[in-house]
Amino acid sequence: MSARKKSAAPKKPVWDPSIVVFACNWCSYAGADTAGVSRIQHQPHFRMIRVMCSGRIQPGFVLRAFEKGADGVLVSGCHLGDCHYQFGNEKAIEQFDKTKSVVKMLGLEEGRLRLEWISAAEGARFARIIDEFIEQLRALGPSPLFADKVPAAAPGEEPEEAIARV
């Protein structure tokens, strides 16, 4: 058999994790927009749900995203001290800690849930966080909970509506 006729082993397709991003309207969502307007390259394997404040993100929202097939969830808000609603991001920390304990009880790895502060001017930071989170989830593999994938949220859709729709 000649060298030309040797067939290469078929390449295994790369698995792309599904991420749900809950983003504060005033900072994190604007940071994602800055990344897009600036044409900063990042991986596209996430669905954005815009909320008015990161303090509004209840554990049930995150758990529903996992239930509907998300491999990871990113909660993002204004930097501490820069919250449009003054103390919303402090409330987000409290909610995040509650959510983290429930996720742990479900047997999911802590690395599937992430909290980040991203300002409107930090488009490059948003892109870097998305890329890092996707690589972290690739190392963990698919979520052991459910196989369904989460669709995108419609513009102006409330978080409850976006999650209930899936």
Regions found by a protein language model. Name each.
Residues M1-V166:
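Iron-sulfur-associated redox domains of electron-transfer enzymes in respiratory
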